[in-house]
Amino acid sequence: MTMVDLGLLTIGNFIRVYSFTSLLFGTILIGCGIAMLNVLAPTLVSYLFPMQIGTYTGMYVFALSLSSSISAGFSAVVSHLITWQVMIQFISIIPVITIIVAIMLRTSGKRKTSAKKPSTPLNPEVKVSVWKRPLAWALGGFMGLQSLLFYSILTWLPPILMASGINQNTAGYLLGLLQLVALPISFVVPRIISSVAKQSTMIWTISGLFIVGLGSLMMAETSFWFAVLACVLLGLSTNMAFSEAMTLFSLKTRTPNETASVSGMGQSFGYLLAATGPMICGWMHGLTTNWFAVLIFLLAVTVVMTFVGLLVDREEYVF
């Protein structure tokens, strides 16, 4: 399944530069690949490292943050040196390399386990429908709302900064800063999350960073340093919120099968909700011709996300 997902990423990314039709089809393939790999990630952590969920979730988030910061920070600059079509197709080499590494790991793993099979099966089947569990819906809501904030900010931050008088290249660097600033805490935050019984302190911290960050973005017209502060705080808050969401899928379940079930449901619902964010922001900007209303909308989403996160914290397990 992993090979198929990576293959979808490779093909989808490579073909989407040729026409509008290939763009739509390629984007669908990329979305399917990312969705399945995201569901797989917390399940693998829960199965392979049940006593080190925070550490390995941190490694996963760190890798995502590093690759995102490199892409966001240098895409605009590199596209001026080579065409954007070539740049996008060149990125397809990354999942190809990952496929090669996955094949090597699978071959190595088969050799080590050929003489010894696991003493117990993966885990008993989940008998209760995850769609009937309120906590699973709350987890999906938290996942979706934090993703909505992230994708909306990622999509519209450069235009917002340019509307504040910042040039395109600098806006690209600031977007890279937003991704890069979270790297030092990527390892730490999931370990903190997995080591405490209650998540309310972390959820309030994430909420506060979002609110101050969005407020600073409103002030970006008055000073360039407000823009820098906004990118730093929003980088921290989006990374911490994603770490919280991904770690909770493992912490709120007892077995890898439960994790897979909850993660699949939560991320399906969550990303469907998140997909509306950039579109709503674009619609609001077209309606009002300014970014203030968009930022107010994102602040409102932050409040709802905080409330949903506190609901998640009230129950210990989904099943």
Regions found by a protein language model. Give the residues of each.
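Helix-loop-helix hairpin linking two adjacent transmembrane segments in secondary transporters
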Residues: 20, 51-110
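Structural signature of the two symmetry-related core transmembrane helices
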Residues: 1-14, 201-216
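Cytoplasmic helix-loop-helix junction between adjacent transmembrane helices
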Residues: 26-62
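A late C-terminal transmembrane helix in Major Facilitator Superfamily
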Residues: 251-290, 298
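Juxtamembrane intracellular "pre-TM" segments in multi-pass secondary transporters
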Residues: 110-139
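Intracellular juxtamembrane helix-capping segments at the cytosolic ends
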Residues: 36-49, 240-254
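Extracytoplasmic gate region of multi-pass secondary transporters
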Residues: 132-186
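Helix-to-loop junctions at the C-terminal end of transmembrane segments
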Residues: 185-198
